[in-house]
Amino acid sequence: MFVLHEIEQSQVDSDIQLFFKHSFSETAGCLGGLDNWPTREQLDLLCERAAGLFVYAMATIKFINHRTKDPKEQLDCLLQLPESTVYEGKAKLKPNTTLDSLYLSILQEAFGDNYPEDDPQTQSILGAIVLAVNPLSSSTIATLLGLSVKGVFLQLSAIHSLLILQEDVNHPAQPFHKSFPDFITDPTRCMNPRFHIFPPDHHSELLIGCLKLMNQRLERNMCRLPDGVANSEVDNLWERVEQHIDHSLRYACQSWHKHLIGLHTAPAPRPRITSVLHQFLEEKFLFWLEVLSVLGTARDAVDALGVAGKWLEVC
């Protein structure tokens, strides 16, 4: 048995170099015309920047292998980007510095040329990706935030190297490593305000999206179940759920209160939330319980109501 942190650094560096060589060889083999690529100097620089972090190496390869771009140009672009916006003495190098520099470089490459007025939408989409209770698809993010599905997917595609992302807009997307949410929600690490995510603001946005969606769509007997029949006795219950309750509404019903919990780190009056929350509790409460019942998560109602009660007491 071995302990990962006890492995010699030279062995880790060697493994990362092998990973880079194998990945570049696969890319060159698939595309052709990439003889003697990358150069030894480029490979050495990538290994130096990786600083023993496989997550850095993986994100680098994902960035270079962008499905619509020239990998050679992607590598050149990445190596030309500054490693950081602040001075870094090697003796004072923090463990996350190299990875943070890569993440920031990828974000700047993807969105740096955007108009400033587009930044709030980009931040909203990034916030949904990193703060979602469960991974969300482009279509669900679009529904909750009131955006176009195509627009959301294009924004996510721009940072595909940081995500697990499929071509299907209905397939959930998520960060490919936990270090990305940690980075983008920490202002001492993500020092570009265009990309930093302040969790309470984006929990608020997702919460309002969930509540509005439930207020719009919830109705009595969503799954058209026969009266007087227990859920367990309905043979095609899940087929009815799939037909009548889409993923966006399921997420809203099961997760809204968890976004409300996310606001407790920065309590402040938020009239928009109070208004839609009151409407939900007064008009859609019983229909919501019905949905939780068919989803098999009715027990969550107790926790959700407790959280809502505490919020309304404060606000």
Mark where each language-model region is.
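Conserved NB-ARC/NACHT P-loop NTPase core of NLR-like innate immune receptors
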Residues: 1-207, 212, 221-226, 232-243, ...
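Secondary-structure edge/capping motif, primarily at the C-terminal ends of alpha-helices
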Residues: 217, 232, 260-267
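Amphipathic alpha-helices of TPR/Sel1-like and other helical repeat/solenoid scaffolds
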Residues: 238-263
